[in-house]
Amino acid sequence: MKRITITLSLVCVSLLFIHCKEQTTTTTPDETAQVVSNLAKVPDSWVAERVAKAQAKFQASKAGQIVWQAMEAHGGLANWYKNGPLGFHFDYKPLDGSVQRNSYQIIDTWSSKARHQAFEDRSKEYGWDGQQAWVTTKDTAYFKYNTRFWALTPYFFIAQPFVLDGGGTNLELIGKREHAEKTYDAIKVTFDPGTGDAPDDYYVLYFEENTHQLGVIRYIVSYPGYFEKGKHLPEKLMELQGITTVNGIALSTGYHTHWLTEDEKAGEHITTITIDNIAFKPDTEKAYFTIPENASVIEGL
């Protein structure tokens, strides 16, 4: 009897050990994502919650429905966030010989943070940590343009229409527009006071009525670092020059920028933009977007 009791006890202990081992090694994908908290990429459950709120907001108006349709046509807002940070090379070339802006960059699409590296020398960097702009201290005079303004500017072009999920955004359907023998639904985007550095900016986005994809971006620049309040550059019109699909997301590969004429047509061609090396970077750590020790905070606009 004693021998049987000992044997049964050993069996029970073995079963308990196996059960505990199974319990400690079984995790859901979201739990795993929570554990790997050093990554900028967020858990899928966070994405699902944010996307559900966004869909409800966009479905509440005709303009919003068109934007949501466009997001779906470009691969879907959920897929956009699930892919994690986005990296690309953005080369902005004015045709009048003024300053070129040419950098590699990685963007935290969830939190709108950015880190740029100069095309000619990738040790020269600047960025936006979500609160402050910065530049590597030894290179404050290297960049011949306003790096605070430029930290997120390329992102707000390539990430259309997904960036319209941000707060403080207002949408207005302004009707149909014709461009290059295609018909588009035109949506005007404005911003609440206090939204970003330039809340007086606006965009007019053209979404092709059949494919629902973006074809044209019209915009103004009212950045206070360049202009007194209430003033801005004349409106510009950007034509998308191509689209590539990366991890299921349709993104532009370049733009031609024109002055907008009085009859809302493309006027003088003033800038050529090319975008390449486009790839999502899901392994990027949160710390990548913090201000480096060898950098200085940019004061003012």
Q: What is the meaning of each model-derived region?
A:
Residues 1-8:
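Bacterial N-terminal signal peptides that target proteins for export
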Residues 21-23:
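Bacterial signal peptide processing site
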Residues 49-52, 56-58, 62-141, 172-173:
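N-terminal mature ectodomain segment of secretory-pathway/periplasmic proteins
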Residues 184-289:
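Gly/Pro-enriched, hydrophobic low-complexity segments
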